[in-house]
Amino acid sequence: MKWIASLLLSTVCFFGYGQQQLSAVSDGINRVNNDLLTSWLNDIRPEGEDLSKVEGSPYFLDEWVYGKVVSVRGERYGDVRLKLNLYQKELMVQPLNSKDSFLMDDSKLLQFAFVGQDSTHTFVRVQKLEGQKPEPYLDFYQLLVSGNMNLLYQPIVEIREPPKTTMATAGGRGAGFYSREDNFYLYNGVSLEEIKGARKPLLKALGRYQKEVDRFISDNKLKPNKPEDLIKIVSFYNQLN
């Protein structure tokens, strides 16, 4: 996850939430209440598989980072540090000036952000609208570009065994965390469409202004399969709307 965490994104500030446009979070003013917590990590850790021997890191960022949280009811919370386990899909929270850690109840979360000095990494939950009723909230996605068309990235971490040849040359190295890095989506407030980085499918998914976007890609020699170029393309598309 280092590449996406260190990518210099067009930074959105923290959050207002519109039907189509997602944005990132205004100052949190309250401390997280107990309704948003599922367990006290120092006390009641849910039982699971032993990950102590798995190489690498399952976290979006390895260190605790100052963050903000927004609940599905629109409540905003600050004064916390956050840590996101991508393999177990768990958001951990630690109040400032405290060593106690808690698990967040993700069913009650709408958005959260890691707030750094140089950039803010925002995660959102989105809904697909079918007919008159919205579907249940989906998993969290990292918000890379905000606008009429939002560019989202779904970080997925898996555990994989190394190839036998690698195990032999690496002295029997064991399983490690592996990050899938091709999970990009376009979200317009109604539909969520996965994009694989190929030029023609991307233009079709964007819908409008295909000629203008195609010319922008050619003039700037961009490659839609590169995350930094994909961000530029979707940002340009939003300028046309």
Q: Where are the predicted features?
A:
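Short hydrophobic/aromatic-rich motifs at helix boundaries and adjacent loops
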Residues: 5, 37-40, 184-187, 202-205
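Long, compositionally biased interface segments
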Residues: 194-241
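N-proximal short alpha-helices
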Residues: 49-53, 175, 186, 203-206
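Sec-dependent signal peptide cleavage junction
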Residues: 17-50
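Exposed alpha-helical structural elements
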Residues: 3, 24-32, 36, 108-109, ...
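Bacterial Sec-dependent N-terminal signal peptides
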Residues: 1-24, 233
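Aromatic-patch recognition
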Residues: 61-62, 67-193
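Extracellular/luminal recognition modules and glycoprotein regions
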Residues: 40, 45-47, 54-65
